[in-house]
Regions:
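Active-site-adjacent structural elements that line small-molecule/cofactor binding pockets in enzymes
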Residues: 1-298
């Protein structure tokens, strides 16, 4: 049992956002971070995903939040590593940009991580926004939303059936399957959502969703869209999880206030993001999280 949050037994699951952009290429820092947040009692570690960054010198007027100089560890590979050095920490992609990847290969990679971690993977997926990245990976940027639904459907079948035949508009499998299958059958799939089509997709397809807005009227409207889409698909909206995000600004009271807002909004999970707070080392990130774990009571 952890020292802080995880030892409190509350239904809200409080995790962390792995500081992808601020830890650099240090494997020891990745290990230290994963082990320490588990010790502190956080329930899960969420990692963002970008395979390549755009070079602003080539892409004139580039205005994206990340570029070719921004560090990103590949989430599923990193999770294979973290699975070996942690024991209870849930490993969450938040989100992996699914349509720029091959669905069957992602299903295989996810199954392997779930197996090696003994059932600790939660696969968050989304569409992404970077056309440069799609081009580099040889995938179509313009139809990514239409393809994602098929990808989720196909992956779930691959995780639960020994052999699969699937004939979709964008994907085809003829009598093939994964071995070994994952521990969790199927692996939970969560969807990052902001637009109405994405919110409807989350309600229709997902086990949970990541809102791209803060608690308030816009979140209330988004939750209603997700719920109505779930009902139309014959699903129970109350069974769909929702994960909010707390932004660390150096103030435990403010973090506690944000947690209370997400709790009131109906979140089942939250994650604490320490990126962008001026923290320079893994130890500084962990010190901030220790303050959160030691003072927030959930």
């Amino acid at each position: 049992m952890g020292e802080g949050l995880g030892a409190l037994g509350h239904s809200m699951r409080v995790g962390v956002v792995f500081p992808q952009t601020e830890l650099g290429g240090d494997a020891a820092a990745v290990r230290a971070y994963g082990q320490r947040v588990e010790e502190l009692g956080f329930t899960h570690l969420l990692a963002y995903d970008h395979v390549v960054g755009a070079d602003p010198a080539v892409h004139t007027g580039w205005a994206g939040p990340y570029d070719v100089h921004t560090t990103f560890h590949e989430p599923l590979v990193m999770f294979g590593y973290l699975a070996a050095v942690t024991t209870t920490l849930e490993l969450v992609t938040g989100v992996i940009i699914l349509p720029q990847r091959q669905a069957v290969l992602v299903a295989k990679q996810a199954a392997e991580v779930d197996l090696l971690s003994e059932g600790r993977l939660r696969l968050g997926v989304g569409l992404g926004w970077n056309a440069v990245e799609y081009e580099a990976l040889g995938e179509n940027f313009t139809n990514r939303g239409r393809r994602l639904g098929e990808q989720v459907e196909l992956m779930r079948r691959l995780w639960t059936e020994q052999t699969v035949t699937y004939d979709g508009k964008h994907h085809r499998v003829s009598g093939a399957g994964l071995a070994p299958l994952p521990v969790t059958r199927p692996i939970p799939v969560w969807i990052g959502a902001a637009s109405r089509p994405a919110l409807e997709r989350a309600g229709r397809l997902a086990d949970g969703w990541f809102p791209m807005m803060s608690p308030g009227p816009k979140l209330d409207e988004a939750r209603d869209i997700v719920a109505r889409s779930a009902i139309a698909a014959g699903k129970d909206p109350s069974a769909i999880g929702m994960e909010g995000r707390i932004t660390w600004r150096g103030d435990v009271r403010q973090a506690a206030d944000e947690l209370a807002q997400w709790t009131a909004a109906g979140a089942t999970h939250v994650s604490v993001n320490t990126m962008g707070a001026g923290l320079r080392t893994v130890d500084e990130h962990l010190a901030a999280l220790a303050a959160v774990a030691g003072n927030i009571r959930v």
